[in-house]
Amino acid sequence: MASTRFALDVPARCASAGTLAPDVPLCLVFGWVNARDAHVKKYTDVLTRELECCATVRATMPTARAFSPFERSRVAYVTEALTFARRAYGGQTPRKVYLFCFSNGGCWVQATLARARAEGTIARELMFDFEGVIFDSCPAFMSMKSGGDALTAVMRQPLALVVRLTFYALVLVLATVHLCTGTYDQMLTRKFWTTMLNMPNEKKELYIYSLSDTLTDPQKLEALIAHRAKNSANVKVLCFEQSPHCAHLRKHPDEYVKALREFIV
């Protein structure tokens, strides 16, 4: 079952059901910037076919929304995703719901939800209380370089250069505006990191990353994890020495699947 933006996959035991029963766990899976759906589906297949532990809603936030300076664009997208998930359960609430974020493209969903809880920008009846949140290669500290790297990771030249330079120019313009108006702390990248540092604790949080992944900046991520643990978050970590950005499943399948099996219970 799929829509233009969102896809629902279910374990074989639920395939004949018109709507899902509340006792079927749900995992919302959001891919990285410019992710191909087939690549994100490899992860939902692990959950629905290999582990058969939950139904999944799969999506990737459009790049323009992920990098938009306007929060309402992301709020609208997340609202659509939550509405789609609710409809799959006939308006009922699954007893267990998980969130699975890849890189900052997916992590923007968690950041948007965290702010929506505080600001009331998403209807409370749409929101879920997560049983756990999985962060794969995120949250990544955003610098001008890392943002350009993420945007152009799968692009070819000369398009990659054009996109990178355009992105740099937009960041400089926005930074100048914030500096001139005394609102630098409200700049998109700073708000994102502050939100991820100080968001309300989930029941449990799993961070999957590698020390060789420069896009994620493992030192910054480890500092964030330590900060959250110090503030009583139930933190679990799966760290690899060598593994590419958002490709830990491919590089370390056994350890990765084991971590998912133990986390989604």
Language-model features and meaning:
Residues 96-100, 132:
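Residue in the alpha/beta-hydrolase core beta-strand immediately N-terminal to the catalytic nucleophile
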Residues 32-33, 137-139, 211-214:
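Residue-level signal for short, function-critical loop segments
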Residues 109-119:
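Short glycine-enriched nucleophile-adjacent loop
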Residues 130-143:
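Active-site nucleophile loop of the alpha/beta-hydrolase fold
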Residues 101-106:
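Gly/Ala-rich beta-loop-alpha elbow adjacent to hydrolase catalytic centers
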Residues 18-21, 164-259:
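Serine-hydrolase catalytic core
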Residues 2-66, 218:
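Short, surface-exposed "cap/lid" segments of acyl-processing enzymes
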